[in-house]
Regions:
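Active-site anion/phosphate-binding pocket segments in diverse small-molecule metabolic enzymes
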Residues: 1-9, 17, 32, 56-59, ...
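Active-site-proximal beta-alpha core segment in soluble small-molecule metabolic enzymes
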Residues: 2-3, 7-10, 23-190, 205
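Mobile, glycine- and charge-enriched loop segments
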Residues: 13-16, 21-23
C-alpha cells in the first residue's frame, strides 16, 4: 500500500479554503487515519488542522507520542482507566454520563490539573450521548460539582446529512437547544456537529467542523479537487494460459470463452481486498486495464491479461 501524505495535506488545505476563517477545522484520524497511518499523517497536518479527533485513548496516546500538542478529542465512550489516561495525556474525552465526569474529576484533582471534556449530545443517532433536556440538565448539575473538568466542547453527530435534510435540520435544532441550555448554565464550549457530509453547509458549521472521510478523498463529490491518497500495488507470481471452457477459482464463477492468459496476484480478502470484487473489478498493468476473474481467494486473486500480451511476472500492478 502506497500512501501520499502530500495528497492528504493538499486535501486538508482544499477543505480549509472552503470554510470561513472563523470556523475551526478538526481532522479525524481515528482507525489509524482511516488506514493511512496516523502517526505520520497528523504531524504533516498540524499546520492546517486546528484539532484532531480519534475514537479511543490508545489513538490519542499515539498522536502525543508523534509530537502532536494540539487539541485531541476522543469521540468514543471509555472505561474508567481510559478516562483517567485521557487526563494524563491532556486529551479531551467525550462525556455524556455523570460517572464519566466524576472519573475525570478524580484523576484531574489527583494530578492537580484541569481535565478537558466535550459534552456529547444524542440528537437522533441513538449511539452515545446525553439524550433529552432533563438528562442534559442533570449532567450539568453534576458538572457544577467538578471544578477540575473544563467543558471544552459540545458536539453531536448527524446520521443522514447526505440525503435527509429534514431530519438533519431537526437534529441541528435539538443541538442548538442543547447549546442554549449549556450557555445559560454559564459554559462557553466549542460547538461542533458537521462531519464531512455537512461541513460546507454554513447552517451546520457552528464553531468547528470535523473533516473525516473527505480528508481522505471520499464522500464529497461537490469538491472535485479532493484526491484519494492510497494506491494498492502488487506483483504477479504466475502467468498461465487456459483453454475455452476452463474455469477459474472457487465456485467456478468464471468460464473462459476464449484462450485466456491468467495472471495470479498474491493478494486476497485476507489482506483486505474485498471478496465481492471477484468478476467485477479491474487492475492496471502496463498502463492498461485488465479484469479480475473468478472469486477472490483469501490470499490470491486472478486477472485476465489476454489483452495485455506483454504483461509478465515482476510487473507492477495497481
Amino acid at each position: 500500500m502506497r500512501v501520499s501524505i502530500e495528497t492528504l495535506v493538499e486535501n486538508a488545505r482544499v477543505l480549509r479554503s472552503r470554510i470561513p476563517e472563523s470556523v475551526r477545522m478538526l481532522c479525524v484520524v481515528k482507525a489509524d487515519a482511516y488506514g493511512h497511518g496516523a502517526a505520520k499523517l497528523a504531524p504533516a497536518l498540524s499546520g492546517v488542522a486546528d484539532a484532531f479527533a480519534v475514537a479511543i485513548v490508545e489513538e490519542a496516546r499515539e498522536l502525543r507520542e508523534a509530537g502532536i500538542r494540539q487539541m485531541i478529542v476522543i469521540l468514543g465512550g471509555a472505561c474508567e482507566e481510559s478516562v483517567r489516561e485521557a487526563v494524563r495525556l491532556g486529551a479531551s474525552q467525550a462525556v455524556y454520563e455523570p460517572e464519566m465526569l466524576m472519573e475525570l474529576e478524580d484523576e484531574a484533582k489527583k494530578l492537580n490539573v484541569t481535565a478537558k471534556a466535550h459534552l456529547k449530545v444524542d440528537t437522533g443517532m441513538a449511539r452515545i450521548g446525553v439524550r433529552g433536556e432533563d438528562a442534559l440538565k442533570a449532567l450539568l448539575d453534576a458538572w457544577k460539582k467538578c471544578p477540575h473538568v473544563e467543558m471544552e466542547g459540545i458536539f453531536t453527530h448527524f446520521c443522514v446529512a447526505e440525503n435527509d435534510p429534514e431530519f438533519t435540520e431537526a437534529q441541528n435544532a435539538r443541538f442548538e437547544r442543547a447549546i442554549q441550555i449549556v450557555r445559560a448554565a454559564g459554559y462557553s464550549p466549542i460547538a461542533h456537529a458537521a462531519a464531512s457530509s455537512a461541513m460546507l453547509n454554513p447552517r451546520y458549521q457552528h464553531d468547528m467542523v470535523r473533516a473525516g472521510i473527505a480528508l481522505y478523498g471520499g464522500g464529497m463529490p461537490e469538491v472535485p479537487e479532493l484526491q484519494y491518497a492510497q494506491t494498492l500495488i502488487s506483483m504477479p507470481i504466475r502467468m498461465e494460459t487456459i483453454e475455452p471452457g476452463d474455469t477459474v477459482g472457487y465456485g467456478r464463477t468464471f468460464t473462459a470463452a476464449r484462450r485466456t492468459r491468467v495472471m495470479t496476484l498474491p493478494i486476497g480478502y485476507g489482506d483486505g481486498y474485498p471478496r465481492l470484487l471477484g468478476n467485477r473489478a479491474e487492475v492496471l498493468i502496463r498502463g492498461r486495464r485488465a479484469p479480475v476473474i473468478g472469486n477472490v481467494c483469501m490470499d490470491m486473486l486472478m486477472v485476465d491479461v489476454t489483452d495485455v500480451p506483454d504483461a509478465a511476472v515482476g510487473d507492477t500492478v495497481v
